[in-house]
From Swiss-Prot:
Gene3D superfamilies with a match to the protein in the record: F1F0 ATP synthase subunit C (1.20.20.10)
Organism: Neorickettsia sennetsu (strain ATCC VR-367 / Miyayama) (Ehrlichia sennetsu)
Gene: atpE
Annotated disulfide bonds: none
Protein name: ATP synthase subunit c
Membrane topology of this protein: Multi-pass membrane protein
UniProt site (Reversibly protonated during proton transport): 58
Function: F(1)F(0) ATP synthase produces ATP from ADP in the presence of a proton or sodium gradient. F-type ATPases consist of two structural domains, F(1) containing the extramembraneous catalytic core and F(0) containing the membrane proton channel, linked together by a central stalk and a peripheral stalk. During catalysis, ATP synthesis in the catalytic domain of F(1) is coupled via a rotary mechanism of the central stalk subunits to proton translocation.
GO cellular component: plasma membrane; proton-transporting ATP synthase complex; proton-transporting two-sector ATPase complex, proton-transporting domain
Subunit structure: F-type ATPases have 2 components, F(1) - the catalytic core - and F(0) - the membrane proton channel. F(1) has five subunits: alpha(3), beta(3), gamma(1), delta(1), epsilon(1). F(0) has three main subunits: a(1), b(2) and c(10-14). The alpha and beta chains form an alternating ring which encloses part of the gamma chain. F(1) is attached to F(0) by a central stalk formed by the gamma and epsilon chains, while a peripheral stalk is formed by the delta and b chains.
Amino acid sequence: MELEGLKFLGIGLSVVGMLGAAIGVSNIFSMMLNGIARNPESEEKLKKYVYAGAALTEAMGLFSFVLALLLIFVA
């Protein structure tokens, strides 16, 4: 396999990182809604942790996207 083909294979595999971020964020928010439904008074406590966790999870997807762009345009 040529180097160009391996480059595009790596770009395609970077989708796995973005898929993981999407699944992670959906799990975080579904668990938040589940927790609020069980205990409505915990909403304010949960929100700060949920937003921090979602931001970190989404950052991994963005890093994967940036890596794919670097592979496309730089490598």
